[in-house]
Amino acid sequence: MKKHLPLLSLLTGALLITNFLIAQKADKFVYAVTDINKQGPNWSYLRKIDLNTGAYSDVLLNGADINFRAYSATTRKQFEAPLTDVRYGTAVNAAFATGVAALAYDKKNNRLYYTPMFIDQLRYIDLKTMKVYYLNEMAFTGKPQKSADQGNIVTRMVIASDGYGYAMTNDATQLIRFTTGKKLEITDLGTIVDDQANKGVSVHNSCSSFGGDIIADDEGGLYIFSARNHVFKVNLETKVATHLGVISGLPNGFTVNGAAVDADNKIIVGSAMAATSYFTVDHKTLAATPYKIAGTVWTSSDLANGNLLATANRPKGSTIDLIARQEEATDGKIAIFPNPVTNNQFAVQFNELSAGTYTIQVTDVMGRQMVQQVVALGGSKQVQTIKLNPSAAKGFYLVKVIDQENKAVYSTKILVQ
């Protein structure tokens, strides 16, 4: 990041408001999907691992209970009668029916999003109430019939730095994006493409690249960790997957089935097959070292927390804080477009903010203040075009809007590409 961020131009006398990504303490836990039995293959029980101690919690949710009564994600009301499915009957009522291998933690809303392996549906757990919501009016992949080779089963999911959830099928022919706010929307982004430099290791190959998990970094990228321990980096803009290599140091029989970023910016990985230990992986070298679990080590089909892998360039010697997501406000008072920002400019639309004086604080991801601007806002429905200096560094910028009472009224993030 440059020492000084060029001042952003203001037009029409309105307010500069952009987006906000805040660096704060990393999550020191991961959620894990396990069986009720230590080595069991039924991925229907939710636990939490304390990364400070390596200890598992008791079962937080019994996802195998077919008498479970969930809620509609659309109406927010509890289903009045048990659900039925032509293939699975009333077993579809169980929160983790048919098992779960794709889980993502939404830090802002304190939710766990997931999809059952053989039920084409997005679901989420409200961790404040432990109520479970099913989006049963909308297909997740559009392919309810799962193929014999399990290529169209979703086994990877994460909340990325842009605040969207992303899920991927085993064969990487579908990258699914979903919103995480009040209104859930699902978009099929299409197939992942192999980088020409991959030297024959395809992201679509079942022998090398199926299964596993995905994590997100702080520059808008995704990392695939396959069950065969291969690692790919995915550019979300181009959907190109670049093969980075194979994890070294894992014992024979260890398959990566869950991955999450820990407080030291290492990737903790767990296995559904070999539960003698968890491991941490250095994303630069792909070398694995054992991670000690206290007490019983459970096999796990997936892991999730809210940490992003810190990969952005930072000043030498600076402390790395993992990036915690803080998504765009959803009250409609302010809208920003486009985001990610292209051509070094974007528009800010003010819909319902009261007239008055506001202070804009712009900081980088290290928390250093770059700009403080006081602006008078005259009314609603004002649109402000913001032009960035073409020489401004690419990446995230952090912005907070403070009112006359020194209260933050809006915060979000932009990614400048």
Identify the residue ranges that each predicted region occupies:
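Surface-exposed, proline-anchored Ser/Thr-rich loop/turn motifs
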Residues: 321-351, 363-368, 415-417
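C-terminal tail/sorting-segment detector
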Residues: 3-5, 396-417
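Beta-propeller fold detector
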Residues: 56-86, 133-141, 185-201, 242-248, ...
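Blade-level signature of beta-propeller repeat domains, shared across WD40, Kelch, NHL, RCC1
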Residues: 272-319
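Residue-level detector of Asp-centered blade-edge/turn motifs that repeat once per structural unit
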Residues: 24-26, 105-109, 159-162, 216-219, ...
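Repeated scaffold domains used in trafficking and secretory/extracellular systems
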Residues: 66-74, 95-104, 142-158, 198-214, ...
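Short, surface-exposed loop/turn motifs with a glycine/proline- and acidic-biased composition
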Residues: 376-406
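Conserved beta-propeller blade signature
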Residues: 27-34, 111-115, 164-168, 221-225, ...
